[in-house]
Amino acid sequence: MRIACRPSRIYYIHNFIWIMTEEQAFDLLTRVMYETRKNKRYGGDSVAFEWCWSRKLVRMFDALMTKEFRVDNNYAFLTSYPKWREIFATSFEGRIADHLVCDLLRPYIELELHPRTFNNRVDKGSQAAINQVIEDIAEVTNGYHDDARVIKWDLKGFFPNAWCSHMEICFNEVIEKYRQDIAAEYGDDIPGFLRWLAMICIHCNASNNCELRTPQGLWADHIEPEKSLFSKEPGIGVPIGRLTSQTGMGLYINDDVRWLNDDCGIHTTVFMDDGVMVVPEWQHEYALSLIPELRKRLEAKGVRLNDKKFYDQPWRNGLEFLGTHINPWRLHLNDKTYNRAIERIREFNAIEDKYRFIEKFKATVNSYTGLLKNRTEYRRICVLRDAIAPEWWEWLEWDNRRQCIVSKPDYSFCMLLNRKYNLKLKQHDKSRNHRAH
């Protein structure tokens, strides 16, 4: 798609002149926009933005180049699963700004983060963190033969108590360290522009510029003041749900992760605010002696350990990490998540007009079977499959090899669109799938 262009505008950024037409501005932000909406395609903000989206992109570009852009259209709500938590989000333009900062800096952030930090990383994630803990146990116990201890710690109010100024410093250090590489890749003035945009995204003061989408009384009933941004002074606390916040919190404690692993020699795995240390029995006292020093290092940044969530047991007793019970030679999804899966299937089974919810039902069930497949949970997968009402099998079928549900050929997503909008989309031809040969 192309948009109409007016004559080139000249944008002055300090002493740097950037000549760009509206069409070039459109091309600049389109890639970031597609990346932003990739996993939020049907969200309300994404749908609203796509009305006159090319015009909105050009308007956003104008605001960025004149440094008038602000992240001030925020909203807050509560989620009760897996526990009550305060979530802040922003408009689609604000999310594009988050992606603009994090995507351009992603290669350099990856170089800076310690390999034992797993949240918001390329080719990492929660399952990779769980696998790392399993590998640490196998290595420290010499193939599950020797004694070892597992120490698990948790950070209390990680996001609401973080200092915005310290997070800004973390981003600035990455930008300054790789300034020459960033300038060579994108332009001489881009490092300064990224510093400014990171500052705008971090210091958005979301609690004072937001719309409440959950009744205010629920905050007092379910959210502790220490875990709410509404009880914090300006400059304290970053919103959960923002990409800059989640990426920045990895940088926030990166020095502490490096200190534990490289300086102290302790096998430590960190995912967001959860940490697991695996130590041999002879090193147990030494590892415990590091906890007070770790506490001091974190308190110097406004973060503290949660004394109620400290776990220290022999490795044979197992542990729960990121919703998974890690036991010797087996993994189990925790009961709360599994029971939620059964509950969600029953909710879909109660719907009368099931045909309208085929794709949503399929995505929901497969998200839970995907969690179970990565663990020793074949029996639970079968129970989950048997909980599906018979009416669904009119349009869906079970794939035994992949352990998930798939649409029957006549009810694939393309066929549903063809029937609804009288289209002529072609269905995927399995005979041309070269990976099957």
Protein language model regions, located:
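Amphipathic alpha-helical blocks
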Residues: 50-73
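Conserved polymerase palm-domain catalytic core
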Residues: 136, 141-272, 277-290, 313, ...
